[in-house]
Amino acid sequence: MRARRTSVVMGLILVLGGSLLFAGAGDGLWMTKVPERDRARQNPFDSETNAVAAGAKLFRQNCATCHGGEATGMEKRPNLHSDRIRAATPGELEWLLKNGSMKNGMPSWSRLPEQQRWQIVSYLKSLQ
């Protein structure tokens, strides 16, 4: 009887702990890994009128499979209209695109030229 209760308690601890870990993975903890020099970077394409349209096209080609065509998220992938994305600096978003966050299921897009990553950032910031 005692062994069964211990098993149930341990099971609950594992489920709760796993839930908290999963919740932490998706709550923007990746932002704490962004170096200050990257966080402070400004989008060099901010003033270019075609950057948003170019970024939208790149988003559809590379990101929509996971985040949805309207960037509203799919299954376990986040809605990019969220407060977290609105609050992120352009530098943080470009850093995430470049480095990814495999723990959260976000691949690195370092194979995309830097200009294209910034154009995607322009698009993401336009969603606000």
Predicted regions and their residues:
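Bacterial N-terminal signal peptides
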Residues: 10-19
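Axial heme c-ligation environment in periplasmic c-type cytochrome domains
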Residues: 23-27, 45, 74-81, 98-128
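Electrostatic cytochrome c docking/interface patches
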Residues: 28-57
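Bacterial N-terminal signal peptides that target proteins for export
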Residues: 2-11
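The canonical Cys-X-X-Cys-His
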Residues: 55, 59-69, 120-124
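Gly/Gly-Pro-rich "capping" loops immediately C-terminal to redox-active cysteine motifs
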Residues: 45, 52-56, 68, 72-98
